[in-house]
Amino acid sequence: MVRSVWKGPFVEASLLKKADAARASGRHDVIKIWSRRSTILPQFVGLTFGVYNGQKHVPVAVNEEMVGHKFGEFSPTRTFHGHSGDKKAKKA
């Protein structure tokens, strides 16, 4: 379900503080975040965030196309190792 327009996008308050501090300092370090549910805002464009996926922080460089999406969309939590092969084909 889509969030109603009158509420506006959800962004963690601590995330806004970290992004503003990174913009003010001019440094391009990876900003570690755990808030996968936060919406990517236009002021985050050009910054790199380390989005936690349950094991490690996946670096996500934000660009214009990502605005409006959630951080969790760009940090997959599950790894697919493929289905097992056909046992009949291996024996032959």
From Swiss-Prot:
Which HAMAP family does this UniProt record tie to the protein? Ribosomal_uS19
At the top level, the lineage of the source is Bacteria
Protein name, as recorded = Small ribosomal subunit protein uS19
Q: Which GO terms describe its cellular component?
A: cytoplasm; small ribosomal subunit
Q: What does this protein do?
A: Protein S19 forms a complex with S13 that binds strongly to the 16S ribosomal RNA.
Has keyword Ribonucleoprotein?
yes
Q: Which family does it belong to?
A: Belongs to the universal ribosomal protein uS19 family.
Alphabetized UniProt keyword annotations: Ribonucleoprotein, Ribosomal protein, RNA-binding, rRNA-binding
User: Which Pfam families did the record assign?
Assistant: Ribosomal_S19
Q: Which Gene3D superfamilies match?
A: 30s Ribosomal Protein S19, Chain A
Question: Gene encoding this chain?
Answer: rpsS
Give the record's GO biological process terms.
ribosomal small subunit assembly; translation
Q: Which InterPro entries match?
A: Ribosomal_uS19, Ribosomal_uS19_bac-type, Ribosomal_uS19_CS, Ribosomal_uS19_SF
Source organism (scientific name): Bradyrhizobium sp. (strain ORS 278)
Q: Which GO-annotated molecular functions does the record name?
A: rRNA binding; structural constituent of ribosome
Taxonomy of origin reads:
Bacteria, Pseudomonadati, Pseudomonadota, Alphaproteobacteria, Hyphomicrobiales
The residues the entry assigns to the signal sequence are none
Q: Does the keyword Ribonucleoprotein apply?
A: yes
